[in-house]
């Protein structure tokens, strides 16, 4: 692949994540604010959180994939442009986000056991990522996108900075492939 086009591909991939992550985080925050303790409200909130968290997991996995697919190209960019991105990807790996995505969110069968992942194992993996209670989940969301995220170090800021850098590179202003 032509290096000039790699900047364009990365820019468009990051642009999607720049939209998807804040949206899912915002909806997740809203879902946590249960209006009452009725079983209907709890089930509704749990379903919304599940959808939001799965979207977040898939989006964060895409950052991991961008590093895998475009790592050589990203390595040619100035360190100050990629440092936060690479740190975020390391944190994604440390939090077992890729494992949860591959064992539960994106597949019905666990490749290790050749069976569906148990609900207990899925819950344990998710809790290791998002935390065990709402305050920890909100802290996880803040790592990705704090409510007033502009200019604050977070995953969305590193996505924006790398996207903007790629946009200005030769070939970065091309239409979506």
Question: What is the role of each PLM region?
Answer:
Residues 1-96, 111, 119-177:
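Amphipathic alpha-helical interface segments
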């Amino acid at each position: 692949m032509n290096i000039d086009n790699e900047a364009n591909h990365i820019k468009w991939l990051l642009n999607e994540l720049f939209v998807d992550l804040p949206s899912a985080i915002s909806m997740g925050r809203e879902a946590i604010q249960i209006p009452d303790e009725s079983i209907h409200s709890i089930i509704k909130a749990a379903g919304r959180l599940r959808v939001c968290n799965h979207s977040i997991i898939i989006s964060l996995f895409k950052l991991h994939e961008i590093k895998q697919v475009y790592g050589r190209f990203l390595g040619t960019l100035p360190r100050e442009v990629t440092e936060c991105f690479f740190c975020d990807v390391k944190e994604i790996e440390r939090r077992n986000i890729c494992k949860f995505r591959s064992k539960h969110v994106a597949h019905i069968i666990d490749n290790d056991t050749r069976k569906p992942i148990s609900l207990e194992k899925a819950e344990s993996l998710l809790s290791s990522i998002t935390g065990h209670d709402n305050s920890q989940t909100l802290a996880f969301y803040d790592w990705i996108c704090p409510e007033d995220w502009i200019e604050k170090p977070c995953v969305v800021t590193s996505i924006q900075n790398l996207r903007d850098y790629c946009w200005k590179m030769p070939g970065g202003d091309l239409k979506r492939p």
